[in-house]
Each structure stands twice: as structure tokens, then as C-alpha cells.
Amino acid sequence: MDNPIMARAGVRGRYDVIVVGAGHNGLVAACYLARAGRRVLVLERRPLVGGACVTEEIFPGYKVSTAAYVASLFRKEIVRDLRLGEYGFEVLARNPSSFTPLPDGRSLTLGPDAEWTRREIAKFSARDAARYPEYEAMLERVAAFVEPTLAMTPPDLLRPGPRDLLRLLGLGRAFGRLGDRAPEAVELLAGPARAILDRWFESGELKATLATDAIIGAMASPSTPGTGYVLFHHVMGETGGRRG
């Protein structure tokens, strides 16, 4: 017998899985379940799907993202597995990537062009402008270690089997390849963003701009342990083969 609540909603039949909410996470889960042969029903109360990743016309003639500020953290493996590009999915790079207006009329604009970014940072600190490429290279090196683990099933540490031991061995080897960056990687994953930015840079304007990635959506200050990872996590986004 059909569920009376489902019947009132005009939905009939039997399903293996019901996903409540057609946000991007729910849609991805539903697609993978359907690929695995499950009969899936997705329920959404709004007239459009996408959850926080939607574009809406909130002023006549102007369409904006009404929630998500970036979409580059959407995993490339998902785009590939679900063949989203064949259906028109495309992530556009932000240009500029950030704009920081200051009370004295100055501003700091960062973007994908390395020389432009260097000149912008140099307005506040020549030292920071010189160090910024090294900072980005450090983040890239740590990201190369962390990123493959995002789609990995964590090893069972309580009752490890042969596969768990192989995963642990692989993680240990990958971590060892970080070399002298290993302590910095640990701090990025567990420490406060402020300590990291203070060590790399002297300009308050640049540090404030970069710190926004560490606190957005986190309800925490840059001095809170763990915000280093929030800062780092945003670096693992990717658009057209470019991180950020």
C-alpha cells in the first residue's frame, strides 16, 4: 500500500531511497545511488533544484547566486563520474578573486594573474609580494597530499585488515614526501589561521583578505584552532585545472 502522505503529494510507487532536499549534495547522492541500481526519489519543496547552489533573479534584470559564494569545491571526480559537462555544467573562474576596500580609499584586488596580484600586494608590502608565490607553492604541496584522501574510505584503526594497513602505509609515505613542510601541514590541518598568516606576511591588509577564507561559514575567529584547515580547504577548489 502506498504511503498516504506520499499519495497526497502525488508521488506513488515504492523506492529504495528517499532523498529529502534537492540541493547539490542530495542530487549527487541520488545520482550515485541510482547508478548503483537503487530506485531513488528526490523531494524538494521549492520550485527549483540546487539548494544553496542556485542562481535567482532577486532584482529585475539581475541574476545572482543567492547563497553559494563559490562552486569550485565541487569535486572534479563527481563531474567526471556523472558526466556533468555533457549536460552543460561549467565552473567559471572568479576574476578578480577578491576585492578588499579600505577606509582610507585604498583597495587590494587579488586575481588569477600572478603579476597583477604581485603589484597589488606590493602596494602594501614588497616583502609580502615576494613571499606570496612561495606561500601558494606551500599550499599546493600540502594540497597534493591531502586532496586524494577526500574521496578515500578512512582506514579502520580498531580492527585493521590488509587493505587498511595498505592505506595507512600509503598515507605515511605521502606524508613523508612533504619533507620540511610536514610541520606546516600539521598546523594547516589543526592550527589557527592567524598563526600561519602572521608567520608568512606582515601586511594587515593582505592577512585580512586571506583570513576571510578561514572564517567564512565557520562562526570562529582566525585565532581559533582548526581555522587553518578552513583556509586551506578553499585552496583545494579547482576551476579549469587552476586551484582556488
Residue ranges and their predicted role:
Residues M1-R8:
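A short, compositionally biased domain-edge/stem linker segment
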Residues A9-L157:
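N-terminal glycine-rich phosphate/pyrophosphate-binding loop and immediately adjacent elements
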Residues D16-V17, D180-R181, G244:
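Short, contiguous strand/loop micro-motifs
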Residues E44, S97, I215, G228, ...:
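Ligand-binding pocket scaffold of soluble enzyme catalytic domains
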Residues F59-Y62, G217-A220, R242-G244:
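A short glycine/serine-rich beta->alpha loop
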Residues V70, A220-S223, T227, V235-G237:
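N-terminal low-complexity, intrinsically disordered patches enriched in charged
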Residues P103-G226:
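Rossmann-like flavin
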Residues L188, H233-G244:
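Helical element adjacent to the flavin cofactor pocket in flavoenzyme catalytic cores
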